[in-house]
């Protein structure tokens, strides 16, 4: 409230009737302000030193309350206040703009995911949520399996310590500890939600990874897994199935010939 009164300026000078002429150097002038601000209804009387070298002004309100202020200080404070208000307006404008940009990005991201990733209605309604929980369980299993402490390994050489074998070294080294949980989680999710998993891989390959790196990864995957491990495993499986059928047929023929 006091700063509101400091913002007021005397607007005119009047000399009361019946008073002697006023000496600018030895007497005080009487100034009248019609209205200090919107909160003051009655007129206020202001007394100030008439010297041009002193800008200190005393404001006397209708309830005999005096406020001493400096016109120069008042102008400075008013400038500071206007600067603060201007900076606050700029910050508010930036904040509103940032909120709108975040909302637009969120809307665009949701639309992109719905169109390119979660576009299989059956998996969205029935499989995605259970697949996420199962993948989390597989991730925890990978963490447990790759933790050296869970293998009874001890650096102190206690009675429960085990010898460092090949399997222990393969599963507990640093690359395995970093990759094995994610491999377990990804494989589990791909088995229970295959369409969504393929969409995720496609989005990562086309939109996130550099084209050259994505092509190199795809070629390595095809050469190592698709044309290598998967093809040989399918051939081995079909060979075992065929040999098993032939063996069963031979046994049945032998039993039949032996009986008849």
UniProtKB/Swiss-Prot annotation:
Topology term for the membrane: Multi-pass membrane protein
GO biological process: proton transmembrane transport
Spans traversing the lipid bilayer: 127-145, 170-189
Compartment(s) where it occurs, according to its Swiss-Prot or TrEMBL record: Mitochondrion inner membrane
Function: Component of the MICOS complex, a large protein complex of the mitochondrial inner membrane that plays crucial roles in the maintenance of crista junctions, inner membrane architecture, and formation of contact sites to the outer membrane.
Stated family: Belongs to the apolipoprotein O/MICOS complex subunit Mic27 family.
Protein name: MICOS complex subunit MIC27
